[in-house]
């Protein structure tokens, strides 16, 4: 995007707003305890391993997750993605995983977009398209596939936010905010689609076990316009991003021949507990606000321990992160789509939010925040 677009956007007092959010999940809903049984076959060599995994799954705060893969609650003879062998060999390759991504991600994206537009907004009126994903990529990519399936204008402005991880939705909102401020008639469509369950790995490591108990598949779409559009919505006030360098090795996402490899250390909740409060103070200071002004919290449900760390960091009373806990319980961690699932729940159940703070975390360790009101 041209630097002048951002300069012009942030030299104005106008706001952008979210006018609609849609979500979609794949067909296969797996109970957390069914996934546990599958993963015990993968990781548990001994009864002690099984007991440890059972404890972790029971403590996860997750009841179910969705996947494009049916195998996680099927008997071995009914597996479709993994080899029907106790050794799981030959283990699915990166090529097979990307084939599955290319098959399912565009269709799931379209389901979320249709839920977002909900017959009230015509696809031909969309001027800008931003696709977000860290679980698959190709060229031509998700942006062109969505454009074709939704019959969007061939001249549409499009861009992609790739491989940024769980905070990428906030980054996309920031890009859309700049567009809407610079172009008053813009209608910006964001779609975040993550097929995390394609990338579960074979090696018995704590990172792989943690990823296998946390992540699910899902898609979320957002329609944004300039503030003077007549449609009601959530007005976006400000954005703030900060990196915690000491956590750069504690959360990572890398390519390998067998898929994408997750690094997710147990130190992350401690880092967030130590640093999150200060980051939010600096974010709120941009608009001369403080914690007392905040009425609502939209926090990425990265995991139960992360939400507990935020509770401690901000000295919350019980219930202030209830929407985040609900999304974690119903869907697991959906990477970039998660925070939009939380925001949708809030928008559809709360009539007024005088000061909302949203935050998501990802590799870096990066914290992306935004403030909003309606």
Map each language-model feature to its residues.
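Claisen-condensing/thiolase-fold acyl-transfer catalytic domains that form or cleave C-C bonds
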Residues: 2, 10, 110, 134-135, ...
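Condensing-enzyme catalytic core mediating Claisen C-C bond formation in acyl metabolism
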Residues: 2-100, 187, 196, 200-274, ...
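Short coil/turn connectors at secondary-structure junctions
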Residues: 13-16, 123-127, 154-157, 183-188, ...
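Conserved beta-ketoacyl condensing-enzyme motif
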Residues: 56, 60-152, 291-307
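Short, well-ordered amphipathic alpha-helical segments that serve as non-catalytic structural scaffolds
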Residues: 58, 62, 104-118, 175, ...
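Glycine/charged-rich beta-loop-alpha catalytic/anionic-binding loops adjacent to active sites
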Residues: 92-93, 124-128, 149-162, 202-207, ...
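Acidic-glycine-rich active-site phosphate/pyrophosphate-binding loop
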Residues: 137-152, 190-201, 249-253, 307-321
């Amino acid at each position: 995007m041209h630097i002048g677009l951002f300069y012009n956007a942030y030299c104005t007092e106008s706001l952008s707003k979210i006018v609609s959010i849609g979500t979609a999940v794949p067909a296969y809903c797996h109970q957390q305890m069914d996934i546990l049984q599958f993963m015990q076959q993968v990781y548990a060599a001994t009864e002690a391993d099984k007991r440890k995994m059972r404890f972790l799954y029971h403590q996860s705060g997750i009841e179910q997750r969705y996947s494009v893969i049916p195998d996680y609650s099927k008997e071995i003879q009914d597996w479709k993605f993994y080899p029907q062998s106790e050794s799981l060999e030959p283990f699915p390759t990166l090529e097979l995983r990307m084939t599955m991504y290319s098959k399912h991600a565009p269709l799931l994206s379209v389901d979320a977009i249709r839920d977002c537009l909900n017959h009230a907004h015509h696809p031909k009126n969309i001027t800008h398209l931003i696709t977000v994903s860290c679980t698959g990529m190709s060229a031509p990519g998700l942006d062109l596939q969505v454009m074709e399936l939704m019959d969007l204008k061939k001249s549409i402005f499009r861009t992609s936010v790739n491989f940024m991880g769980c905070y990428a939705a906030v980054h996309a909102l920031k890009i859309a905010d700049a567009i809407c401020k610079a172009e008053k008639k813009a209608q910006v469509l964001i779609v975040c689609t993550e097929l995390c369950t394609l990338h579960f790995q074979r090696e018995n490591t704590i990172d792989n076990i943690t990823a296998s108990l946390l992540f699910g598949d899902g898609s979320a779409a957002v329609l944004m316009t300039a503030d003077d559009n007549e449609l009601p919505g959530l007005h976006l006030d400000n954005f703030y991003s900060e990196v915690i360098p000491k956590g750069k090795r504690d959360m990572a996402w890398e390519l390998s021949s067998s898929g994408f490899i997750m690094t997710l250390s147990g130190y992350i909740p401690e880092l967030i507990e130590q640093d999150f409060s200060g980051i939010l103070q600096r974010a709120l200071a941009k608009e001369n606000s403080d914690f007392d002004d905040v009425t609502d919290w939209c926090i990425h449900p990265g995991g139960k321990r992360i939400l507990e760390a935020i509770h401690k960091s901000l000295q919350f009373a019980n219930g202030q992160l209830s929407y985040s806990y609900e999304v974690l319980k119903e869907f697991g961690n959906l990477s970039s789509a998660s925070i939009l699932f939380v925001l949708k729940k809030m928008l559809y159940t709360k009539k007024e939010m005088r000061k909302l703070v949203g935050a998501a975390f990802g590799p870096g360790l990066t914290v992306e925040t935004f403030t909003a009101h309606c």
